């Protein structure tokens, strides 16, 4: 018979972040998006403290099988990437030791549901603390001049080159906000893009000052399951999103860019972090009712 951790009904949910098992403190997007704003604004959630009693646990990209086996309260694995496609571990086995799995995109949810059909699997989008966002762009005027991309540099290497012909054709100034400067010898580097090291506040401010946010996709399977958080950030800041070269061509027109402002109200309603906290509460309640 396995040992079990004794659970007290504290009403408190501990969130175990990805960084719990890492020995460096570099910013991690999943923690910034899916842990920090929830524990900041919702006192029934907190970052996991070893030895503290919790009513329920959320493993945010933290694949801690031993704890999942021992802890007897409601348990959720929260996923923002299909890491088992890249790394060697048995995700299905781990999934059998929790009650529910939450995913940052609908595509990832559908994939996980096929792997583990007998568990609660829910889509919990990346959401935000909008009080931290700067003033949005406002109305767009004239032809677009500034395009911006942000994220991890290796993803820029993977996705940005497909947009290089249109960036060059329209003479757009390209700003890359990332962990490291763009270094791949290709058409993007030939455009001599500006570089700013990623920080939350400066990144969002710079996006709000741009005309177009670039968010190209990759054909690789891993990218298929990415969330739409970059687009949501841009829409909240009043900046339109170009996924393809044709989008860039269309968004050179200020009227086309201003049509994107209509998405602002939708983002305000659907992507506030309070909605994620409530989704987790509802899932925990469903688990307790099983």
Where are these regions (language model features)?
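Extended catalytic core of nucleotide-activated donor transferases of GT-like folds
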Residues: 40-113
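Nucleotide-sugar-dependent
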Residues: 154-158, 200-201, 205-206, 211-236, ...
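Short, polar loop motifs at secondary-structure junctions
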Residues: 61-65, 105-110, 177-186, 244-247
């Amino acid at each position: 018979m396995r040992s079990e951790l004794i659970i007290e009904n504290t009403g408190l949910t501990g969130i175990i972040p990805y960084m719990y098992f890492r020995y460096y403190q570099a910013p991690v997007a999943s923690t910034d998006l899916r842990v920090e704003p929830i524990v900041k604004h919702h006192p029934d959630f907190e970052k996991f403290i070893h030895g503290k009693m919790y009513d329920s646990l959320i493993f945010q990209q933290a694949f801690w099988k031993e704890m999942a086996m021992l802890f007897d309260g409601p348990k959720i694995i929260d996923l923002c990437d299909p890491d088992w496609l890249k790394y060697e571990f048995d995700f299905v086995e781990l999934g059998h030791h929790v009650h529910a799995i939450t995913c940052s995109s609908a595509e990832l949810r559908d994939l996980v549901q096929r792997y583990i059909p007998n568990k609660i699997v829910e889509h919990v989008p990346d959401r935000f603390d909008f009080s931290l966002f700067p003033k949005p762009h406002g109305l767009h005027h004239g032809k677009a001049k500034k395009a911006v991309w942000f994220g991890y540099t290796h993803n820029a290497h993977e996705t940005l080159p497909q947009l290089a012909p249109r960036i060059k054709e329209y003479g757009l100034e390209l700003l890359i906000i990332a962990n490291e400067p763009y270094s791949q010898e290709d058409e993007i580097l030939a455009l001599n893009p500006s570089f700013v090291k990623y920080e939350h506040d400066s990144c969002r401010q710079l996006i709000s000052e741009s005309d177009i946010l670039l968010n190209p996709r990759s054909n690789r399977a891993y990218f298929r399951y990415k969330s739409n958080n970059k687009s949501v950030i841009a829409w909240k800041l009043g900046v339109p999103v170009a996924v393809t070269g044709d989008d860039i061509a269309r968004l050179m027109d200020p009227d086309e860019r201003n049509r994107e402002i209509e998405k602002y109200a939708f983002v305000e309603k659907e992507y506030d972090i309070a909605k994620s906290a409530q989704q987790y509460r509802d899932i925990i309640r469903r688990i307790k009712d099983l």
